[in-house]
Amino acid sequence: MGTLDTKGFTEEQEALVVKSWNAMKKNSAELGLKLFLKIFEIAPSAQKLFSFLKDSKVPLEQNTKLKPHAMSVFLMTCESAVQLRKSGKVTVRESSLKKLGANHFKYGVVDEHFEVTKFALLETIKEAVPEMWSPAMKNAWGEAYDQLVNAIKSEMKPSS
């Protein structure tokens, strides 16, 4: 498993992440797409990082490759957040972390892309569970996301 030590993710943060994820899980396809639409609204140039979007004339909402990609990113991000405290480390499927790191490296992802994604993720969650949203929940999801990003960055090198 891809792992990185997770200091600083508290029991309270875990509870907030789990509670909100349980409320969002059933809508993960729709929320994943919303996340990516927010990312591209904030940083339109980020579309160039995706081969299936580069020359596409199809509206983003109707792109058949964006939807499954967006859902898998949203699911992986949220599942990783939920597992963080239980496992004591960032956990994603076997070899995924190395692959994620290599892909993000290959496509030229930089810190700013991760920052835009974090902002878009927090906004997406806030809109998905407005009745639960609080500064503490924002911090919990922010911490979980930061730890996942640090784990991905630790693997950002050419694939061997």
Curated annotation (Swiss-Prot):
Pfam families listed in its UniProt record: Globin
| Additional information | Constant level of protein accumulation after induction by hypoxia may indicate a higher turnover.
**Which reaction does this chain catalyze?**
Fe(III)-heme b-[protein] + nitric oxide + H2O = Fe(II)-heme b-[protein] + nitrite + 2 H(+)
Q: Please state the gene responsible for encoding this protein.
A: MHB1
Would you tell me the protein name for this molecule? Anaerobic nitrite reductase MHB1
Q: Which GO terms describe its molecular function?
A: heme binding; metal ion binding; oxidoreductase activity; oxygen binding
Q: Which SUPFAM superfamilies match?
A: Globin-like
**Keyword Metal-binding found:** yes
The record describes how the cofactor is bound as:
Binds 1 heme group per subunit.
Species lineage: Eukaryota, Viridiplantae, Streptophyta, Embryophyta, Tracheophyta
Query: Which conditions up-regulate this protein?
Result: By hypoxia, but not by cold stress. Repressed in roots colonized by the mycorrhizal fungus Glomus sp. R10.
Q: Where is this motif: Homodimerization?
A: 41-45, 111-123
> What does this chain do?
Phytoglobin that reduces nitrite to nitric oxide (NO) under anoxic conditions (e.g. during flooding or in waterlogged soil) and upon root nodulation. Required for general plant development and during nodulation, especially for the onset of symbiosis. Monitors nitric oxide (NO) levels during early phase of the nitrogen-fixing symbiosis and buffers oxygen in functioning nodules. May not function as an oxygen storage or transport protein. Has an unusually high affinity for O(2) through a hexacoordinate heme iron because of a very low dissociation constant.
Membrane-crossing residues?
none
Q: Where in the cell is it found?
A: Nucleus matrix; Cytoplasm
The UniProt keyword set, sorted, is: Cytoplasm, Heme, Iron, Metal-binding, Nucleus, Oxidoreductase, Stress response
- Assembly and interactions? Homodimer.
Cofactor(s) required for function per UniProt:
heme b
Q: Which CDD domains match?
A: class1_nsHb-like
